[in-house]
Amino acid sequence: MNTKSVKDIWKAIEFGEWRKPTSGLAPGYTQANVVILPKKDAFDFLLFCYRNEKPCPIVDICEPGQVAPPVAGPDADIRVHVPKYRIYRHGELDKEVDDIKSYFTEDMVTFLIGCSFTFEKELLEKGVPVRHMEEGKNVPMYVTNRQCQSAGIFSGPLVVSMRPIPAHLVDKAVEITAPFRKAHGAPVHIGDPAELGIKDINKVDFGEPPNIKEGEIPVFWACGVTPQMALKNARPELVITHSPGYMFITSITDEEIARL
């Protein structure tokens, strides 16, 4: 699957042949978090992303009712090309579904937000291990004690993803990821999880628990699940997102996203 074209991957997702997390899928292409919400809430959400660019770097925005992201996937259909979606009603998770054709209306605005899965290929190619990819797991994600800047109806805490990195490679990991500004860039924290309010690193809020080996340091990047916490607080009537770890594969290459 990893060697297939992006269009082949979209088709596989649409027909139910891929229903797993997308870390490591389509190496060399940018992955994106998905937030779809009514037009009346779109400006407040846009402002929230602008004020919190580290966890919410915007890759693309659709017009109301538009299903093909004009920059990130002009041949895609956002309603069927994500492996798993979440449906939120009034801030509460209602269900997870495989497509959103029955929920998407002409009033819905789609936001694509950068994802740290994008820089994992670069880490691997330059000798920095990525544990969850080695083990075929979803990345560990945590809600922190850091608050984002509020905007309109949206407010909430920063969410981070974590990758255990051998101590001697931490500086290298920072250097590699920093240029990927549209994929969260450099880490927001290195070391003690307690400083982020994480009491037990083995108890994740999203994803799967980590396997941290001796001599490794937990390294935390801002995460595009952050908007889902803000959406829960804002309690809009209906919001659709990707399920954490099940991203939209864009047709933008890693080289292109690093230049944005």
Swiss-Prot record:
Transmembrane segments: none annotated. The keyword Lyase applies. InterPro entries: D-Glu_cyclase, Putative_hydro-lyase, UPF0317. One of its GO terms (biological process) is glutamate metabolic process. Its EC number is 4.2.1.-. GO terms for molecular function: D-glutamate cyclase activity. It comes from the Bacteria. It is an enzyme of class 4 (lyase). It holds the Pfam family D-Glu_cyclase. Keywords: Lyase. Belongs to the D-glutamate cyclase family. This is Putative hydro-lyase Amet_2975. It comes from Alkaliphilus metalliredigens (strain QYMF).
